[in-house]
């Protein structure tokens, strides 16, 4: 049985780790390389760096942070933010990323996903989907894709987009609920489940973790293969070890360090 992965997420702005509420109100949470080393030592299964300035301020992804992290850490590293071209993917992989996250560029041109997957292998291409519920309380649930750090609505249905990019070669989908991000009220389980049921690739649940039970629900109810969280780890509410033990006690298959 494949083991569920716990993935701390480091949102990086101006070279520092930050954590905001619904992509705003950024709060400094430390140095990214030091944070990464701490998570590696704590037994995180993977780590995710998202350069949240890159897409809308046209800044290059933090290659120096990536290379220093890759030198210091053994866990797999996913890096996203401002990835627009095959050359961007190559540069990040050469800097030490194991996987590269594509967001806005995949929405603008899903064929870019196919091109990147063909050149580097689908196992290292992660498409990041930022979605917001647009259906009313009495309507069938529907979510829309947003780009540029959650600023730009696209009119694109999130579940259909997930199908499209998975068919084009995305090896994994990072699904973030913009309604839930930073609220600490739990994942949007309906969104996560709708996408997990629609595709054959692993789905990472993201956005809204407030406690350890939310991680369990992301897998058990949301159908996710991995769970991503930030605040509960960054500010010391829980350790990765506590999260793994809690999820294992709930009957989920976890990689437990001796």
From Swiss-Prot:
Spell out the Gene3D superfamilies in the cross-references: Aldolase class I (3.20.20.70)
Gene Ontology molecular function terms on file: imidazoleglycerol-phosphate synthase activity; lyase activity
Quote the cellular component terms of the Gene Ontology held in the record: cytoplasm
Iron-sulfur found in the keyword field = no
Associated pathway: Amino-acid biosynthesis; L-histidine biosynthesis; L-histidine from 5-phospho-alpha-D-ribose 1-diphosphate: step 5/9
Alphabetical list of Pfam families matching this protein: His_biosynth
Q: Which InterPro entries match?
A: Aldolase_TIM, His_biosynth, HisF, IGPS_HisA/HisF, RibuloseP-bd_barrel
What compartments host this protein? Cytoplasm
State the UniProt keywords alphabetically. Amino-acid biosynthesis, Cytoplasm, Histidine biosynthesis, Lyase
Reactions mediated catalytically: 5-[(5-phospho-1-deoxy-D-ribulos-1-ylimino)methylamino]-1-(5-phospho-beta-D-ribosyl)imidazole-4-carboxamide + L-glutamine = D-erythro-1-(imidazol-4-yl)glycerol 3-phosphate + 5-amino-1-(5-phospho-beta-D-ribosyl)imidazole-4-carboxamide + L-glutamate + H(+)
Record-level GO BP terms: L-histidine biosynthetic process
Q: Can you say what this protein is called? A: Imidazole glycerol phosphate synthase subunit HisF
- Organism name: Methylorubrum extorquens (strain CM4 / NCIMB 13688)
